Amino acid sequence: METLAPFAAVLAGYLFGSLSFAVIVSRLMGLADPRSYGSGNPGATNVLRSGNRIAAVLTLALDALKGYVPVLLVLLFGPRAGLGTDTAAFVGLAAFVGHLWPVFFRFQGGKGVATAAGVLLALNPVLGAATLLTWVIVAAFFRYSSLASIVAAAFAPFYQALIWGVEPLLLAIGAMSLLLVWRHEGNLRKLLAGTESRLGQKAAAPAGTAPPHPRRGRGHQHGKHAGKGHS
């Protein structure tokens, strides 16, 4: 049974990560599906475009907890089943992958910024805090949330290797960072083209589209917008 424990923990992490709280919160609060407007990305930033700040904050918090809770549970109770920090790191990676490609939501997930932050804070609070501070500094200077996320993701494995050494969990952190940067490919193109939206600036809506509004029953649908945005 101990041989199966790591695989069961990783699977549980992925399934928990597959809970798309952007979609769930929006449904519970009577808002449009975040995959149907704005960037089409089910994340807190896109939910904020609905105009409902409470829904956006709830999405942000739950997405972060989605990465934090599975890792914390393994760290607290895993030793009884022979699971250590390395397993916890890969459980966190699995939760992050679940957010990116959620099995319960047709594999249409977000970009994982909040979930990655939750994973890092649970694995190593100092590393998590350093990474978040990097995000804040870059965002404050350049006013680009996507750029801040990309830079913070790039620095996270660097901090781990420089301060704590090349431990096995560096592999999980590095993989998470690479995936996060890759998911921001569209944002990178916009940054290079000078068309990326700054913090506090509404993303321009494609011509002929209406702003998001609450759902109006089962048959109502919203047109999907082209492009990808930061989440």
Where are these regions (language model features)?
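Helix-coil boundary and interhelical linker segments in multi-pass alpha-helical membrane proteins
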Residues: 1-9, 69-90, 121-127, 160-172
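Short, hydrophobic/aliphatic alpha-helical segments
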Residues: 2-9, 26, 92-103
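Interhelical loop and helix-boundary elements at the membrane-water interface
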Residues: 12, 16, 21-68, 100-114, ...
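Alpha-helical transmembrane segments of multi-pass membrane proteins
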Residues: 13-16, 95-99, 135-139, 156, ...
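Interfacial segments of multi-pass membrane proteins
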Residues: 48-52, 74-78, 112-142, 154-164
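Helix-loop-helix "hairpin" substructures at the membrane interface of multi-pass membrane proteins
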Residues: 50-52, 56-59, 82-98
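Anionic-ligand binding patches
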Residues: 68-72, 88-123, 129-132
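Loop-to-transmembrane alpha-helix initiation sites
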Residues: 129, 145-152, 164-176
